[in-house]
Amino acid sequence: MRVVAAPDKFRGTASAAEAASAIARAVVSRGGTAVEVPMADGGEGLVDVLGGPDHTTEVTGPLGSPVRAGWRLSGGTAVVEMARASGLVLAGGIEGNRPLDATTAGVGELLRHAVELGARRVIVGMGGSATTDGGLAALDAMGPMARYRGVEMLVACDVRTRFTEAAEVFGPQKGASDAQVRLLTGRLERLVQVYLERFGSDVSSLDRAGAAGGLAGGLAAMGAELVDGVDLVAEEVRLDELVAGADLVVTGEGWLDATSFQGKVVGGVAAYAAAAGVPLLVVVGGADEEAAVRADVVSLVDRFGEDRAVAETMACITEAVAERLDDL
């Protein structure tokens, strides 16, 4: 049996690579062959699944203090995660963040540095942001736009939110009060006109432009292409070729809900498996009832209890997959 292991991270308990290895151990224990393909959808973990960081640069953090951000440059392609420069974790989470002050300047500094070092193609992951500045600070930090002519910039998004909706949809998750959400929304509405005048680009109607508090829209204004992150990663790792001829595809994530099938890893991998006519198994930390009926789902919490599922996530993944393989 040939199995493709293509999970997302189990947030807080297992990286995508660790989850893929746990799946592979189960397959090998049952005499099969596993292909490990850790996945990401544009959120945290993008750099890791595309080869891992091989550069570290000191940049402006989300609240102004310097941070050291890892990123990758290989064969003229740079991979940058906004979370490593301007992420919510770096701001101290919801409790520590200052939503009106959080800045994407560090992302712009990374992009400038990547191009200065020779990148002609740049992939930028949007997930995990602390910011709702519409990308203005990033654009300012990037310097003269002329240096980006001829550079292909792909913005990997895991949401389809519009630019001016970013504060309302995601602001509370970043610690913004109702009053701050209104202020941030007004900021984004003004930036629509700023970008129209500066770049001749109307970002107000672009799907995905609200990703990372509007950073995606800011980058789109200067010429970047906004794409679904999971599809971009799938193309980079040639998931379609790996799935072809497989007997089973196993994916998973920490929590399964309706959004898992809307631009996230589980839904993306499921689509590739369906297109190839290959059975799919979804292993998750937990799941809501409605989402769980949309695929063959194994919940670690339901099978092993919450305490063990959290404390021994990788062992539980291996055991759950092995049990399901025995049933095939």
Descriptions of predicted regions:
Residues 1-328:
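N-terminal loops that bind phosphate or other acidic moieties
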